[in-house]
């Protein structure tokens, strides 16, 4: 097995004694949050540490890097190549080529493993905590981007059906900012995210923290930066090991467990909401006259 050369770590260890306390704070943050730094600008790092972007750049240069771009290129080599979704699909279909049973087993085994993990005491306790938070929420916001954005939209509809107002947070750029502006104190955030500390997730967490909104994280990366900041972490395996495609049905499985649990803890609210939806639906059928 080839040993990775940790250029950044080696330089930090050899030069830490030469850094001022402020520069050492920046250098240590980068070392402890490497994945997040890959997605951050100097100004964003500075904002986290309550310092200036010039201080961030000086700290990076003090360790022998030309700047933030040079640092990121070095960290990227340390992390290794990123496996794209097309490469994951290629690995999966090549493994399962011309074997329908193997494809069926791949999905079934992935879901069976997730069911076993979700039923473990630790996850049951985490889901109970999540349900307790959601039952008292003013509104629930469901965060997910990419394929998880579709789950966020669907889940928000399910929560609304049982009488708990819900909104999806599933856009990027200014679109996500427009969704985030609707958050208020008393809300609860349900977040679907993995290891990559992307800007959308970081911004959403910062806004939730500013408003005192608790976060429920559904993830397979229980050691991620998001996991450290969440109020409740539910471990949801996705079956994407060895470069294969991840399964999104496993996340939906967990979401439906949570929604049904919330509905059962507030039965009167759930029944009242469902009855009202049916009444409104009847009024929308052809031939119905408005009063």
Predicted regions and their residues:
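Glycine-rich phosphate-binding loops that contact phosphosugars or nucleotide phosphates
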Residues: 135-253, 259-266
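A short, charged, Gly/Pro-tolerant segment at domain boundaries
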Residues: 268-291
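HTH-adjacent hinge/linker in prokaryotic transcriptional regulators
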Residues: 4-9, 17-18, 24-25, 32-39, ...
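Alpha-helical scaffold segments in soluble metabolic enzymes
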Residues: 7, 11, 25-29, 58, ...
